[in-house]
């Protein structure tokens, strides 16, 4: 999801409007419950992706950017190589298990460290709470960042938590110390 967010932040205007296709509704795992035909901005989808870990948001961004999940995965792999991620291969934008989808802590740290240089990415991953529209409801979706480090570790600046049965609990985090931003 870190690389997905980086690519979206690099190539999209945050105010671009994305119409949610049927293929991005009901995606397995964590979700913001996107609805077919719903319109959200790229920035709203980034908040859904990085705060709520919305797999549906990941696929919506992938389809918006590349036309399909498979084509977006190709773009992810190309970008990962450009960033020096030598031991990674991506098959989807959300990180759900697939035998051909893998990475390492070192590669994720390289990607995350670079991504923090993108102002939109940094803004999104450092946000503790956001509201995004929900057209079919009288209220907005309220998203609380799952990264508890933001409130429990002085100087924490964000990034991403994760969980799958196969990988277990995962965390890539960043923190400012002595005028340096550390990623681990």
Q: What label would you give each PLM region?
A:
Residues 68-183:
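Penicillin-recognizing serine hydrolase domain
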Residues 2-119:
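Active-site-adjacent loops and short helices of periplasmic peptidoglycan-processing enzymes
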Residues 58-59, 182-184:
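Short small-residue beta-strand/loop micro-motif enriched in glycine and branched aliphatics
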């Amino acid at each position: 999801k870190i690389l997905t967010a980086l690519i979206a932040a690099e190539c999209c205007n945050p105010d671009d409007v994305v119409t949610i296709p049927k293929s991005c509704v009901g995606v397995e795992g964590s979700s913001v419950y996107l609805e077919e035909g719903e319109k959200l901005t790229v920035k709203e989808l980034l908040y859904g992706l990085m705060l709520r870990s919305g797999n549906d948001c990941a696929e919506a961004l992938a389809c918006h950017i590349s036309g399909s999940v498979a084509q977006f995965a190709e773009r992810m792999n190309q970008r990962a190589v450009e960033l020096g991620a030598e031991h990674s291969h991506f098959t989807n934008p959300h990180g759900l298990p697939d035998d051909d989808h893998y990475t390492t802590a070192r590669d994720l740290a390289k990607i995350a460290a670079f991504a923090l240089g993108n102002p939109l990415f940094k803004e999104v991953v450092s946000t503790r709470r956001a509201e995004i529209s929900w057209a079919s409801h009288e209220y907005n979706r309220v998203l609380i960042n799952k990264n508890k480090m933001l409130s429990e570790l002085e100087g924490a600046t964000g990034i991403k938590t994760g969980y799958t049965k196969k990988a277990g609990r995962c965390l890539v985090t960043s923190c400012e110390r002595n005028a340096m931003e550390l990623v681990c």
